[in-house]
Amino acid sequence: MALIDCKGVSLGYEGNIVAKDLNFRVEKGDYLCIVGENGSGKSTLVKSVLGLIETHSGHLHMGDGLKKREIGYLPQQNAAQRDFPASVYEVVLSGCLASKKGVFFSKAQKQLAAESMEKLDITELKDRCYRELSGGQQQRVLLARALCATKKLLLLDEPVTGLDPVVTADFYRIIKRINREYGITVIMVSHDLYSAVNYATHILHMKRDGSFFGTVGEYLSSDVYKAFSGGERNA
């Protein structure tokens, strides 16, 4: 059963439809990149998957026992979030809030936070203040926090915005490793078409007048890709 099955979905807000007739499936272990024009509804789709907004029409179904609160979400960072005055460990542990019972975090949750930091190679930063870290280090911390929330699905919204090219390339490799080694399904919104076709298994290309969904190979052969990329093959 697919983790997410989207059939004939239209999305919008304040009476404005921004995406029409979306059709795609996300299976366990997939790495789906969502690309496309500005204003085509990519972030709106993310909000719908998270249950923050309703679909205007169609069906967006979650399978394999996946619950919205079990999605590990890494949003776009703003200035206030970058200046958050907490330790790295506290930020990572906050990823367990959705499963927290009672006043205190459990021993198992604390162990999960430690394991997530180890996966992202940030254990030595655990006592550092989050706002003192570099942009790349902060994104690793936030990804570790997202891992605390899920064993099934990571949802990443433009996770490399503002990072330099070297750090960006490293972050993409980390995400791919998490997908391959730990079997965690990844959905990522990205404007980086080159990295999308080189790391993902599937592409959802959103346009104002429709969408394309398929494997990376199918996408590279499509007219949608050729028109959007200017006819250049990036992979």
Predicted regions and their residues:
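Conserved ABC ATPase "signature" region
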Residues: 107-125
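Conserved ABC ATPase signature
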Residues: 129-133, 137
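Catalytic Walker B motif of ABC-type/P-loop ATPase nucleotide-binding domains
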Residues: 154-158
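Helix N-cap at the start of a conserved alpha-helix in ABC-type nucleotide-binding domains
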Residues: 165-167
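H-loop/switch region of ABC-family ATPase nucleotide-binding domains
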Residues: 190-191
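H-loop (His-switch) and adjacent beta-strand-loop-beta switch element
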Residues: 202-216
